[in-house]
């Protein structure tokens, strides 16, 4: 910030000026201080004006964990929701969605269960083996987020993990006590989860941010932020992807939006959007990707026989 002096006839007018960058353009906030001010009077009015300018700046941007978004950037992200159709599923469509979601979310993580096997597994009285347990578990978790009145919390996050993996993983429902990393097929580290010592605080910060800022963002953008930040934290030893995609849908359902499905065939693009968020704090690719997935979900679920 700096003081700008302007001559106006025989008078000198003073302004406090602050420059900032938004979307590659330099913008200015200019606050009038007065005219013909003495040294002490200028200092006093400058200090008051500085607080006012800082307040304006605070309103213009929102902290989003490791980065900030300006009001203009938030508005642009929120407009992506105009590209999706808001509708409500009937019981048959919910069944179709659940089967599609269960298959894809597990397959993304390496499950060998085929799409056509899912209905039979869900109707079996008892699951056989870890993959069938997780098939039934994820379906139960979908039903849970559909019905629950609970809002986002650490306990809810742990509950979803327990529902998905009870019987298949010894640590179901428990936050990890070991360090974790996401590696690619070559064994190269793509992302390291938050350290164990910071894990609980990171989750608390995520939930506090959600409660404080959820009115600023449209549901799809809000869901994208929480999903990406959850994956950044990586609070479980395993199963973070599936719980993250459930949380994404929990937030959508809380806002009376239909759920969406991220498909196996789009896994590579999905991972790229996460990398953009984690490495470059760029949320736009995720929101654009989710819009496309939303359209595919609606078509798949509402078309007769679930065929596109």
What are these regions (language model features)?
Residues 1-238, 242-308:
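FIC/Doc superfamily catalytic core
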């Amino acid at each position: 910030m700096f003081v700008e002096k302007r001559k106006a006839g025989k008078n000198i007018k003073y302004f406090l000026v602050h420059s900032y960058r938004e979307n590659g353009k330099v913008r200015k906030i200019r606050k009038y201080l007065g005219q013909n001010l003495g040294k002490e009077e200028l200092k006093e009015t400058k200090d008051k004006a500085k607080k006012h300018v800082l307040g304006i700046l605070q309103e213009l941007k929102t902290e989003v964990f490791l980065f900030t978004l300006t009001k203009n950037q938030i508005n642009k992200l929120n407009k992506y929701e105009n590209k999706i159709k808001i509708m409500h599923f009937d019981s048959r469509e919910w069944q179709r969605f659940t089967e599609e979601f269960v298959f894809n979310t597990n397959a993304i993580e390496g499950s060998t269960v085929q799409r056509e096997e899912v209905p039979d597994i869900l109707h079996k009285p008892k699951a056989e083996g870890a993959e069938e347990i997780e098939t039934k578990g994820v379906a139960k978790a979908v039903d849970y987020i559909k019905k629950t009145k609970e809002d986002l919390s650490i306990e809810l996050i742990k509950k979803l993990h327990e529902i998905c993996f009870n019987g298949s993983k010894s640590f179901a429902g428990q936050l990890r006590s070991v360090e974790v990393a996401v590696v690619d097929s070559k064994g190269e580290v793509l992302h390291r989860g938050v350290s164990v010592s910071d894990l609980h605080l990171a989750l608390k910060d995520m939930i506090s941010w959600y409660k404080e800022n959820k009115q600023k963002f449209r549901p799809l953008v809000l869901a994208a932020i929480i999903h990406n930040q959850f994956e950044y934290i990586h609070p479980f030893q395993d199963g973070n992807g599936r719980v993250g995609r459930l949380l994404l849908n929990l937030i959508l359902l809380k806002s009376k939006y239909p759920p969406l499905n991220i498909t196996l065939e789009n896994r590579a693009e999905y991972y790229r959007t996460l990398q953009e968020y984690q490495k470059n704090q760029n949320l736009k690719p995720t929101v654009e990707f989710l819009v496309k997935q939303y359209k595919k979900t609606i078509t798949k679920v509402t078309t007769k026989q679930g065929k596109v």
